[in-house]
């Protein structure tokens, strides 16, 4: 690498040429050279998934794509790592990237045991005494980036952060797929380029409705690099009684290797054998019809509510707010006392969000004003349903919102549809999330 986070200039071109004159075997990367002279690798940082695919699909792309920095693993993060690796595995020219970064760089404030003592050997009281600090923890006046030095795959105590498990899964080099659940045939793909799977064993277990019922091991795997072999997992199909059944597969080291011990799991898969059905047959028909027609009453204006009732269902919508005020089935409240359902455009900001100050940039969406304009109620006697459409004006975000409640009297089900219409060209920030 010629450097990081600087600019492009003639000195870097000369440095590139000098390196090539000394050693023609090694590729050179430099992010600011982009796709031109001075690099052998197109190595952008934080390149969007869509841009990566566009580059990978372009037959004129001049060099391999390896992001010099990506997957900013700060706090709750790494959710789209699979999107990148689906493309890496699809396009040979896209060859991965370098995570930012390895470890949270927080500092010990109080050391109760040497770092050679693993945290799991400490008791809870000792663990609570261990403190890690970052910018702002020492005083209020020194310049600080707060916790922006804590963006690692592992913690400052060298224990795995939650997102480390996603990184490990996406980077694993052995993959299993179900070929036939009836016969137990599973394909095993060795994604390694230079080694076979002779030092790995396949451990399997059958899980029925969350309980392990069968297990075993295939000790010898004969799969060359970049090849696939099919194995038969010897579970007894005749003994399966569960409604939801999974085949869990682990690939484990038979002998120790550098940094890894014998028996360590290096790859895994969970494959469906029997899938649980939400309903038998036509789910849409079952949602509407249930097990027979129920007598329904509709009171559209009484007590300032829209009320739909059957022997099993009580559904009420508040005419002053346009929102559900009560939903009970067989006498049990589905919302709890004072509960309601309302549109939501927010979620808890993550560390990465706060690094970009999105909690302030998007704050208009946290609790935007919703002015009720109209309520429309229609009863369909033939279908035994009631459709309620509430319309809102949302001036702070320059949009309109329609919420449709389709009440199925026969089953007590309520289908809710939100339709937000933004004003084209309006200067409104993005939102974190749209839901209810």
Each predicted region: which residue ranges?
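Terminal connector regions
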Residues: 237-283
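Intrinsically disordered, low-complexity Pro/Gly/Ser/Thr-rich segments with frequent PxxP/GP/PP motifs
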Residues: 201, 207-243, 251
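Short, well-ordered beta-strand segments enriched in hydrophobic/aromatic residues
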Residues: 184-190, 308, 312, 390, ...
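Solvent-exposed, conformationally flexible loop/turn segments
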Residues: 179-181, 223-228, 301-303
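A short beta-turn/strand-edge loop motif at beta-sheet boundaries
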Residues: 193-200, 241, 426-430
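Extended substrate-binding grooves/exosites of carbohydrate-active enzymes
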Residues: 1-187, 192-213
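Acidic (Asp/Glu-rich), glycine- and aromatic
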Residues: 250, 264-270, 320-322, 399-401, ...
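Acidic-aromatic substrate-binding/catalytic surfaces of carbohydrate-active enzymes
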Residues: 261-262, 266-268, 304-395
